[in-house]
């Protein structure tokens, strides 16, 4: 069969009753004037959460905590902190990501002009602050100056008041509320200032930019860091479909960009009720729901208010859902059906699971997904949770397990809820656990996947993701064709 445009290709497959996954298809090369460096990979994770690179890390306890989420955001993607943590533990992980790049300190620690230097030092010791710069307020809470490390360094009398050694407000460059990180950078460079207080219309402190962080964000990331409007890394968190969901999101809300309702069956009354509760309680927060594998399910969730749909039931390398239960659609067909069903609703699809090779990422995006979620492709790296295990033969491995594996169901209430475990006896496991080779830093993996996606889109002549999704033509490939596609006869 010749290569067909996407609509015709999937209609033919549908008419034949054939459902496809990544190894069943390849994409046709086209005349191209687009170099890999020119490709724009900007996309969205959910309705209001942007991506510079269409990658996300799976909410699994052997894949994503803060280290992985930080790495993903620095490469333009987003990490979803798993829910197999207590609320306090998940809060700390989310906060660690959000404050990793503290471009704008929204609520800076302040001191009063009437306090002594010794009193300030005592507070620093008590609260374990490792900084010594503070906006200074008067009795009416108005900004009157700035206390910095040099004021401590050159003071011989710690009983002196803050106001006697601080730099007064009249000598400090400041900016209004709403100043962007780039405008702040320009102002700080022009005036050679390391701190830039933001003041509201009444003269009260409303934020503080720190030059070291601002400079790192503006200059050091080549436009790849996925940051919010305040220059902080974007991060998401998984929540279970139970009574703790609202409390969990309420605890995380200050630092959270998106909540992901994590269920093996997203088209269920439990997911519906959790989505309804979260949208009512947090109307401005994006809520992604998953997982589903049919267009009807995706549209139903979107019409109930979901801001993104996670597609994939059973495609993961450590998932046994399809084998144990007989349900689920091969992933390419599932993504296609969900994308088609969501037309006109402006709700992105996340292709979750089944990515085995870098080329699969491009296929998922061409099929219509706005991003891909990866587990195995990121597991086994330094940034994945867990210790490196040294084997007797000298090799190094890390643990990788599905959230439906026996040990995950035993260890995590969120995992048990995700897989609908109830009743008596041992729960049905829908995943396995294994050790996988230690891969080193995930940054090397992400760099590889980024280059592969750009190269793929260049072969097709797609300068951006919208063009990739609109113009790519598909082949149905045979098993022999797939064998030929890999290295062979060597």
How does the language model describe each region?
Residues 1-31, 111-112, 176, 183, ...:
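Alpha/beta catalytic cores of nucleotide-metabolism and tRNA/nucleoside-modifying enzymes
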Residues 67-70, 244-254, 293-311, 355-370:
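Catalytic cores of alpha/beta
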Residues 74-89, 258-268, 307-325, 355-389:
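Glycine-rich phosphate-binding active-site loops on the catalytic face of alpha/beta enzymes
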Residues 83-98, 140-158, 188, 197-218, ...:
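Terminal amphipathic helices with adjacent charged low-complexity linkers/tails
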